From Swiss-Prot:
CDD domains: YlxS_C. This is Ribosome maturation factor RimP. It comes from Vibrio vulnificus (strain YJ016). InterPro entries: Ribosome_maturation_RimP (IPR003728), RimP_C (IPR028998), RimP_C_sf (IPR036847), RimP_N (IPR028989), RimP_N_sf (IPR035956). Belongs to the RimP family. The gene is rimP. Signal peptide: none annotated. One of its GO terms (biological process) is translation.
Length: 151
């Protein structure tokens, strides 16, 4: 998580929670002149398009007042989806036993991309079962992690 993403999470979480939703996480993606702030929300009853519109309205109001982003960007609010991104230690704990794709900031054993089943979480690191072997990764070294949907 970048410094800006951390700042945005702290700034927006209370608005999302006050609307009755969980802020799963967010990503600020810079792609040349077209940046995107993508916010993932969830609710025990699932997420509808109307839910996304409501949260978008609330979040936009906060962003308009605080103005933390200095470049033009698009705001997207969505459910985490089947390939749910994992941002917090609690997310990894919630999905112990599920298969994930993990991209690391710094390579471990000459690899940045890993695929395995979440075996355990200790707060600072996760352990994946990869090809029958246990591999431990510091949460601070994880750039991106997504569930692999089962069909």
């Amino acid at each position: 998580m970048t410094g800006l993403e951390r700042q945005l999470t702290e700034m927006l979480e209370s608005a999302v929670v006050a609307s009755g939703y969980e802020l799963v996480g967010l990503e600020f993606i810079r792609a040349g002149e077209h940046s995107t702030l993508r916010i993932y929300i969830d609710h025990e009853n699932g997420i509808t398009v109307e839910d996304c519109a409501e949260v978008s309205h609330q979040v936009s109001a906060v962003l308009d007042v605080e103005d933390p982003i200095s470049v033009a960007y698009s705001l997207e609010v969505s459910s985490p989806g089947l390939d749910r991104p994992l941002f917090k230690p609690a997310h990894y704990e919630q999905f112990i036993g599920q298969e994930v794709n993990v991209v690391l900031k710094m390579a471990v054993a000459n690899r940045r991309k890993w695929k395995g089943e979440i075996h355990s979480v200790d707060g600072e690191a996760i352990t994946l079962t990869v090809d029958g072997q246990q591999e431990e990764f510091a949460l601070s070294n994880i750039s991106k992690a997504n569930l692999i949907p089962k069909f």
